[in-house]
Amino acid sequence: MADSANHLPFFFGQITREEAEDYLVQGGMSDGLYLLRQSRNYLGGFALSVAYDRKAHHYTIERELNGTYAISGGRTHGSPAELCHYHSQELDGLVCLLKNPFNRPPGVQPKTGPFEDLKENLIREYVKQTWNLQGQALEQAIISQKPQLEKLIATTAHEKMPWFHGKISRDESEQIVLIGSKTNGKFLIRARDNGSYALGLLHEGKVLHYRIDKDKTGKLSIPGGKNFDTLWQLVEHYSYKSDGLLRVLTVPCQKIGGQTGNDSFRPQLPSAHPATWSAGGIISRIKSYSFPKPGHRKASSPQGNRPESLVSYNPYESDRGPWANEREAQREALPMDTEVYESPYADPEEIRPKEVYLDRKLLTLEDKELGSGNFGTVKKGYYQMKKVVKTVAVKILKNEANDPALKDELLAEANVMQQLDNPYIVRMIGICEAESWMLVMEMAELGPLNKYLQQNRHVKDKNIIELVHQVSMGMKYLEECNFVHRDLAARNVLLVTQHYAKISDFGLSKALRADENYYKAQTHGKWPVKWYAPECINYYKFSSKSDVWSFGVLMWEAFSYGQKPYRGMKGSEVSAMLEKGERMGCPPGCPREMYELMTLCWTYDVENRPGFVAVELRLRNYYYDVVN
């Protein structure tokens, strides 16, 4: 969460206020001397420590919901660095201008907090246990959903802590604290019925109770004390500083056999859990815990409805209280919750049919068409697999003239699709020869990206960034498999949910041999020229690098909410424009960094154009920065 500041030489990471003051003293305490540190109270926030009049002054920098940073009541900024630069020129509430940064001494790295140290392992274990993923499916889930998973882990980490006892009464909490050792500072936290919490603290043989309130914004605090985003941050703070309590927190109170309180809410502790509260930080005690499962992957059903029992935490929605999981309100799924994240044949009991031909008797079609084209129509259907009924999209070949070329095109597309298996690519279930040739594929209910964005202008930038990043992950996979798509456009990206995109339509796709890096077409066909790189138009040469050009156009479509590229221009006019070095302008409201990536994708010289490895990494880093 400190990624946006780690590169700054004056950023010290998660040091305490006292440590910051010590550093400023080392620097001479001259007016305007300053350093930046990570907030110990707010997720993704920072604190600015400034010397003035021989005293240290501290300002909290909160991360706003839109991803900007601001000192309370002050102007918002795109990054902590921009905020510091601004306050080097404008007071705007500070005691003095920022003049001299106090940089970290040589060899000193930003200090990571306990959660930062462990979050990679926590996320990996959480994804493994919650969605039962392994291998590439696990890695893809972590990469694409890391910001959401970080928030999920951070805001629910207290449920796995030894000091959190769930819903127990005040009397029960006193009994538990008084069992065993009577060490001063022994403590536990319990949940109260109104959504707040209470701290039980042992002092001189008596249990003191402190209320932990939760305000409308979700901030937690002991009355009169500091605000915190999470319970574990609150506990970490009061473990090194009493700050209004009679004493600091020392020893967490263990659950009795892991069976007290609300066991449906709280995971059972492993029997090997250590009984002592040794050095190493509060969070270090959750390494060996098993995570509760908020939901499982969506089960297939003919109706395509999501059972209430499978509803899981949705990090895209605002917090609705600590007991939101107990409510039956519908929440939107993460990609891993959907039935199309993994291949239907990932289940070893589901045997892939030989030569991918399906039994027509097991396929049911709806009458309503989802779409149509020169090839025929697409309908929604249901395919009876061995264990489940799977909702599918069926491309039905319209071949009244019995043209063998049309059948060959469909079979060629099927041949490409059967070789691909990635969460961000529409998978083929199989092909069916009956009243017509049919290509049976995974269903993406929300349809093409361009049409969805045209009809849903409320979709925010960070949601669009999330979707185009997923597309880049799918294209990186194609690049690694030596496939060229040749028809990458927003119309061929289908949405499973508002937060889950898949690449489709492999009718023009080609597999390259291991010794090839491009495909050369023999003739000019009915090509989507406005999405094509100059070398495709001029020399009929197609490669992953030409797909990168198309991806830049797709990004432009997405950030312009489904508008047509080069509107009103003919293909020849577009070619002339590109030859002159001109490119489409930045869509209104599009982040500067995203337009810069588009123009990089539109590099004329194919050798200097980035590949999808570089494009995906750049998108990933920006996505993490704006969503965190």
From Swiss-Prot:
Domain named Protein kinase: residues: 364-624
Location of the region described as Disordered in the Swiss-Prot/TrEMBL record: 293-312
An individual GO BP term: defense response to bacterium
Keyword 4Fe-4S annotated: no
Regulation: Autoinhibited. Intramolecular binding of the interdomains A and B (also called linker region) to parts of the catalytic domain keep the catalytic center in an inactive conformation. The phosphorylation of the interdomains or the binding of the SH2 domains with dually phosphorylated ITAM domains on transmembrane proteins disrupt those intramolecular interactions allowing the kinase domain to adopt an active conformation.
PROSITE patterns hit by this protein: PROTEIN_KINASE_ATP, PROTEIN_KINASE_DOM, PROTEIN_KINASE_TYR, SH2
Residue stretches making up the SH2 domain: 10-102, 163-253
A GO molecular function held by the record: non-membrane spanning protein tyrosine kinase activity
Phosphothreonine: modified positions: T250, T338, T377, T523
GO cellular component, as recorded: cytosol; early phagosome; plasma membrane
Enzyme Commission number(s) from the entry: 2.7.10.2
This protein's UniProt keywords: Adaptive immunity, Angiogenesis, ATP-binding, Cell membrane, Cytoplasm, Immunity, Innate immunity, Kinase, Membrane, Nucleotide-binding, Phosphoprotein, Repeat, SH2 domain, Transferase, Tyrosine-protein kinase, Ubl conjugation
Phosphotyrosine modified-residue sites: 23, 42, 126, 289, 316, 341, 345, 357, 477, 500, 518-519, 539, 622-624
Region (Interdomain A): 103-162
SMART domains xrefs: SH2, TyrKc
Region annotation Interdomain B: where it falls in the sequence: 254-363
Function: Non-receptor tyrosine kinase which mediates signal transduction downstream of a variety of transmembrane receptors including classical immunoreceptors like the B-cell receptor (BCR). Regulates several biological processes including innate and adaptive immunity, cell adhesion, osteoclast maturation, platelet activation and vascular development. Assembles into signaling complexes with activated receptors at the plasma membrane via interaction between its SH2 domains and the receptor tyrosine-phosphorylated ITAM domains.
Free-text comment on this protein's domains from its UniProt entry: The SH2 domains mediate the interaction of SYK with the phosphorylated ITAM domains of transmembrane proteins. Some proteins like CLEC1B have a partial ITAM domain (also called hemITAM) containing a single YxxL motif. The interaction with SYK requires CLEC1B homodimerization.
UniProt name for this protein: Tyrosine-protein kinase SYK
Lineage start: Eukaryota, Metazoa, Chordata, Craniata, Vertebrata
Gene name per UniProt: SYK
